């Protein structure tokens, strides 16, 4: 007698099938875009759908190579601050306040050389990652850990997947070399940017977060980086596997498809400290004599399998060394517009205006919610939105002294906002958040670019395109653009406004126009009609109609609303927590994207399933059904903001749900602010 599945079970099963079908098509599309270097389309997929975890080590370097904030960088400074009273900069000493400066340290500052004890502090911070979990009960901390187990031979029948490979633990000496390499990447960044940014422990966790997705070569300092070296030809490349679930993933990551590591290693290796399980290491084992089946990315492909025929299409030459890629990632995460310049421009415009009201209130006009502000402004907006959207949760969180944000770098708000989720978010969630940061792109014209990068003096619009540049773009990109034909943080009429033009040079001028266009609902101005963009999903074969949607607001402002969505997503749970439990949640947010993560882990698990027969392009019927569900959630009513207990969407643990919720919060909150403003 067959068990009869409930409608709910069937619903989840169908959702799983659709998600796996979409993910397989996303992987194939991404590989094709990488091959033809269509970085515009890759950025679009990264900020909307996310980069498949199997491919981040290939896609992230491309995104960072063309990122506007890397081409024209400006980062927040912790060495100087602006004093509005004296209208001048003042020097800060953001670290080592308890240590009296020595002659050696003073001399090193003058010569733009790092203080002598900074490297030891960096090493201390990095080691926290590797030893964040104690040894299992009964294990000896003094055990010999210098032996590395012999890898289990892999048969040719496993060519389609390497999920059965054993992840080996390196020796302590090897771990120290890895830590040294990470430290050197941070030191290189500080040597270049030390006059603007002194070391903070956030840099260590950003480097570690990058190393969880991008391979590092531990002997880079002894053997200089060479772009001719392949990931798959050079031995000893390492990918960190994450500190939170390393032990669990190592032993159980294959759902029973692999033997326990204890069956293949000696007793000495079982006593390796917990940090040792955080590493995957390259060996000489290969399949079909192909470099693409190297153990270089063994942990990554063990956790997120990728068939051989797809791996063989990936480029083999790294674009950047780890230290170079870390610098670019740090430039994006620490990016800050020139707020001093923005205030001066607003003041000059106010002085030139005949309106005395504008002249006296120019400071109130500086509210860069679209173009982005500094960390102080981001923190202000975060708590302003928090108190407005979640008042019942905001009150207890702000009343508890241990939960209040402070200048301490142990504060949860430091990790959330300044470090873009480093340390506080799980590896999978942080990777998806960084996808959004690295995929951020404004419209490809200099007015809009300079609206977000107000300090910029470089011409870069020729690097970007508003149409896909891949071969047979209609074939590859049309359905993806149709699914997300709007930026998640769209706002009515915002996309039709020429940001940065003479008419809309500042955020407040944009706000005035938005109020004018939307205050009397149903009225569409001539300007709106003239700027109406054809639907990307139209049936026309005109190439110009296949337009890529671009980002509407600054990426760090987007993160604010994503974090508010995380709090709203867990509101009922947090209201029941004690103070210590809330603090643990804020500093160590549980995995949010379980559904997405599980889908990618099991993507190629059932080889006999009908969904494993991957078409060359998304089929019309399946993509149409996905488009219907995506559009309905993307354009959900601004007033439908409550979480319903037992809601399927709430239980799905999908980042798309968080992203759509964040967009809803953005629109609801901004319109409320505009209605209450005096613009």
Curated annotation (Swiss-Prot):
One annotated Gene Ontology cellular component of this protein: cytoplasm
Function according to Swiss-Prot or TrEMBL: Required for replication of brome mosaic virus (BMV), a positive-strand RNA virus.
Biased composition (Polar residues): 524-539
Family listed: Belongs to the OCA5 family.
Top-level taxonomic group: Eukaryota
Ranges for domain Rab-GAP TBC: 50-441
Name of protein: Oxidant-induced cell-cycle arrest protein 5
Bias (Low complexity): 135-153
Positions of the UniProt region annotated as Disordered: 135-159, 250-270, 524-544
Keywords: Cytoplasm
Subcellular location(s) per record: Cytoplasm
Gene3D superfamilies: Ypt/Rab-GAP domain of gyp1p, domain 3 (1.10.472.80)
């Amino acid at each position: 007698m067959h068990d009869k599945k409930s409608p709910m079970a069937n619903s989840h099963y169908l959702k799983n099938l659709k998600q796996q079908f979409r993910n397989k098509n996303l992987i194939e599309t991404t590989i094709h875009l990488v091959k033809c270097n269509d970085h515009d389309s890759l950025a679009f997929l990264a900020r909307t759908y996310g980069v498949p975890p199997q491919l981040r080590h290939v896609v992230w370097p491309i995104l960072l190579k063309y990122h506007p904030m890397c081409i024209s960088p400006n980062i927040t400074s912790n060495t100087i601050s602006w004093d509005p009273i004296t209208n001048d900069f003042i020097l800060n000493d953001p670290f080592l306040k308890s240590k009296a400066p020595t002659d050696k340290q003073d001399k090193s500052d003058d010569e733009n050389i790092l203080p002598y004890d900074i490297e030891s502090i960096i090493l201390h911070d990095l080691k926290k990652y590797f030893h964040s979990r104690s040894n299992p009960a009964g294990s000896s901390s003094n055990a010999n850990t210098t032996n590395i187990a012999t890898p289990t031979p892999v048969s040719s029948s496993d060519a389609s997947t390497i999920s059965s490979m054993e992840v080996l633990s390196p020796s302590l000496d090897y771990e120290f070399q890895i830590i040294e390499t990470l430290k050197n990447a941070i030191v290189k960044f500080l040597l270049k940017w030390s006059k603007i940014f002194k070391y903070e422990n956030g840099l260590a966790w950003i480097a570690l977060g990058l190393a969880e997705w991008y391979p590092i070569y531990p002997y880079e300092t002894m053997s200089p980086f060479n772009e001719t070296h392949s990931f798959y030809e050079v031995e000893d490349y390492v990918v960190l596997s994450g500190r939170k679930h390393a032990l669990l993933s190592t032993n159980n990551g294959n759902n029973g498809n692999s033997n326990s590591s204890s069956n293949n290693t000696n007793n000495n290796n079982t006593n390796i400290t917990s940090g040792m399980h955080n590493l995957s290491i390259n060996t000489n084992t290969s399949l079909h004599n192909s470099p693409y089946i190297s153990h270089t990315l063994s942990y990554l492909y063990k956790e997120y399998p990728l068939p051989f025929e797809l791996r063989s299409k990936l480029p083999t030459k790294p674009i950047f060394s780890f230290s170079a890629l870390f610098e670019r990632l740090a430039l994006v995460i620490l990016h800050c517009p020139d707020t001093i310049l923005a205030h001066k421009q607003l003041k000059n415009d106010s002085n030139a205006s005949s309106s005395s009201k504008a002249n006296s209130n120019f400071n109130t006009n500086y509210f860069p919610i679209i173009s982005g502000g500094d960390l102080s402004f981001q923190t202000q907006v975060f708590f302003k939105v928090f108190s407005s959207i979640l008042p019942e949760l905001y009150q207890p969180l702000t009343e508890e002294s241990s939960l209040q944000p402070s200048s301490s770098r142990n504060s949860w708000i430091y990790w959330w906002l300044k470090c873009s989720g480093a340390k506080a978010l799980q590896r999978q969630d942080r990777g998806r958040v960084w996808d959004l940061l690295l995929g951020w792109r404004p419209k490809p014209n200099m007015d809009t670019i300079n609206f977000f990068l107000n300090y910029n003096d470089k011409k870069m619009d020729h690097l970007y395109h508003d149409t896909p540049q891949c071969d047979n773009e209609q074939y590859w990109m049309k359905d993806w653009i149709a699914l997300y034909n709007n930026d998640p943080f769209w706002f009515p009429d915002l996309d039709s406004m020429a940001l940065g033009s003479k008419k809309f040079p500042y955020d407040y001028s944009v706000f005035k126009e938005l109020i004018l266009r939307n205050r009397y609902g149903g009225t569409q101005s001539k300007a709106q009609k003239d700027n109406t963009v054809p639907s990307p999903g139209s049936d026309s074969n005109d190439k110009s109609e296949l337009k890529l949607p671009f980002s509407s607001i600054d990426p760090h402002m987007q993160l604010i609303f994503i974090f508010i969505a995380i709090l709203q997503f867990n509101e009922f749970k947090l209201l029941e927590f004690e103070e210590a439990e809330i603090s643990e949640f804020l500093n160590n947010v549980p995995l949010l994207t379980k559904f997405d993560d599980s889908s990618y882990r099991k993507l190629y698990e059932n080889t006999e399933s009908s969904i494993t027969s991957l078409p060359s392009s998304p089929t019309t019927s399946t993509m149409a059904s996905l488009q219907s569900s995506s559009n309905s959630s993307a354009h959900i009513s601004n007033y439908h903001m409550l979480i319903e207990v037992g809601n399927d969407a709430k239980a799905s643990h999908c980042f798309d749900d968080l992203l759509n919720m964040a967009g809803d919060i953005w629109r609801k909150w901004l319109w409320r602010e505009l209605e209450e403003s005096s613009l």
